[in-house]
């Protein structure tokens, strides 16, 4: 397993070609299990020290080799709650094993919360992801260019437009020319409480362009691979919108 480094150069295309398992823990937290069994967790959550509770319970007992926080807000920064004595990545840096590469690219939080936020690139099983955390839509073009084209983007959207408008969320996601958009950071029964003031995503889904295919997954876990991802439309004449994949619930950790 590699040591963590602070490099943030251009991100190369994903390693391997066998696919990678991704589990949606809830809110903005996802777990990748690479072909070499390396486990990478992004944005474990916790309730705030004061104010209304956001979550229906404590963060579940997830074991990981690397725990990543995109930024230092309570609902993204509970890396100390992760089991397995993971390596921690809480700012720009890199992590790599034979089966997975993770690169955190420095950017900025959306809205009134002007603070650092990392765009976290995960490459495994021949698939390239970017987890946007709570990133702004009016991003630094150089930061986004360093990430490059991805297969899957995780973006924060909900019907309350808590972080940014639906159009702004779409603009952020499309900057990476993804094949699939995965929504996150919304009201999810059993995980996120209504007292968070977040809402669901049904109105957001209804607002999407007419050619967007919405795929609702059966549960919180799926395998992403070249065989299951939609084909990339390479020419302007045949270009189509990406698909939107919505993870199901409720989570069971194995």
Model segments located where?
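Metallo-beta-lactamase
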Residues: 3-17, 77-126, 209-232, 237-240
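Active-site neighborhood of phospho(di)ester-bond hydrolases with catalytic His/Asp-centered motifs
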Residues: 41-45, 63-79, 105, 130-133, ...
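Active-site-proximal loop/helix segments of hydrolase catalytic cores
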Residues: 109-176, 187-189, 193
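Soluble or luminal CAZymes and related metallo-dependent hydrolases
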Residues: 24, 164, 196
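Pre-active-site segment of Zn-dependent metallo-hydrolases
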Residues: 5-14, 25, 29-66, 76-87, ...
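Active-site-proximal beta-strand elements of phosphoester/diester hydrolases
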Residues: 21-24, 39-43, 100-108, 119-121, ...
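Binuclear metal-ion centers of metallo-dependent hydrolases, dominated by the metallo-beta-lactamase
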Residues: 114, 176, 180-254
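Zn-dependent metallo-beta-lactamase
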Residues: 1-36, 227-230, 246-254
């Amino acid at each position: 397993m590699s040591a963590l480094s602070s490099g943030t150069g251009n991100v190369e295309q994903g390693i391997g070609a066998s696919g990678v398992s991704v589990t949606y823990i809830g809110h903005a937290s996802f777990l990748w299990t690479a072909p070499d069994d390396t486990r990478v967790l992004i944005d474990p959550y916790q309730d705030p020290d004061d104010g209304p509770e956001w979550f229906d319970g404590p963060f579940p007992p997830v074991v990981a080799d690397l725990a990543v926080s995109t930024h230092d807000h309570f609902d993204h920064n509970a890396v100390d709650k992760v089991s397995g004595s993971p390596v921690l990545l809480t700012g720009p840096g890199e992590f790599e094993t034979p089966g997975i590469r993770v690169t955190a690219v420095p950017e900025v939080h959306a809205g009134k919360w002007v603070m650092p936020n990392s765009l976290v690139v995960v490459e495994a099983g021949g698939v390239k992801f970017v987890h946007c955390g709570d990133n702004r839509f009016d991003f630094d073009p150089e930061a986004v260019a360093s990430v490059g084209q991805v297969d899957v983007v995780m973006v924060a959207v909900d019907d309350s437009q808590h972080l940014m408008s639906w159009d702004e969320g779409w603009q952020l996601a499309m900057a990476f020319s993804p094949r699939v958009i995965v929504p996150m950071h919304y009201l999810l029964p059993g995980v996120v409480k209504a007292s968070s003031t977040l809402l669901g995503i049904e109105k957001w889904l209804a607002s999407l362009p007419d050619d967007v295919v919405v795929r609702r997954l059966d549960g919180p876990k799926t395998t992403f691979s070249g065989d299951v991802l939609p084909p990339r439309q390479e020419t302007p004449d045949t270009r189509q919108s990406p698909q939107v994949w919505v993870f199901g619930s409720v989570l069971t950790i194995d």
